[in-house]
């Protein structure tokens, strides 16, 4: 078989799969900023990274699985946390629950409605 034809077929096959890949729905630009701000506030309130880690969902881009609501009032995140390594325990044993409301533009913490023991 012609090497050039073989290479062209390989390229066509590899490119053919690209159309099947779907991009994740785009997030508002403010959402990842808001998520980072909320996570950093929880870290600060709970003793810093030496003694606290937020749930893994808060490290995902935009923290969509920790996002309770998105409205004209802002982004409300709710997540658990605990000492470093809590999520690797079996079963995971978080010790704290935090809710943080961040402005619609992702620039300011508007409120921390709850930060304390898991309810």
PLM ranges: what are they?
Residues 24-61:
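Short, non-transmembrane alpha-helical segments in secretory-pathway proteins
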Residues 1-8:
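Bacterial N-terminal signal peptides that target proteins for export
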Residues 8-16:
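Bacterial N-terminal signal peptides
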Residues 12, 27, 66-68:
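Residues embedded in well-ordered secondary-structure elements
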Residues 93-119:
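A short, surface-exposed interaction/processing loop segment used at functional sites
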Residues 54-101:
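Exposed beta-strand-loop-beta-strand "reactive/processing" segments of non-cytosolic proteins
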Residues 18-24:
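Sec/Tat signal peptide C-region and signal peptidase I cleavage site
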Residues 24-30, 41-45, 75, 79, ...:
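Central antiparallel beta-sheet cores of small beta-barrel/beta-sandwich binding domains
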């Amino acid at each position: 078989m012609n090497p050039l034809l073989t290479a062209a077929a390989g390229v066509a096959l590899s490119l053919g799969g690209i159309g099947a890949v779907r991009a994740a729905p785009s997030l508002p630009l403010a959402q990842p900023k808001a998520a980072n701000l909320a996570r950093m506030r929880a870290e600060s309130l709970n003793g810093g990274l030496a003694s606290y880690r937020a749930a893994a969902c808060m490290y995902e881009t935009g923290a969509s699985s920790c996002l309770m609501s998105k409205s004209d009032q802002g982004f409300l995140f709710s997540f658990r946390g605990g000492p470093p390594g809590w999520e690797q325990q079996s079963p995971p044993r978080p010790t704290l629950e935090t809710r943080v409301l961040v402005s619609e533009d992702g620039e300011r913490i508007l409120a921390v409605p709850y930060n304390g023991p898991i309810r």
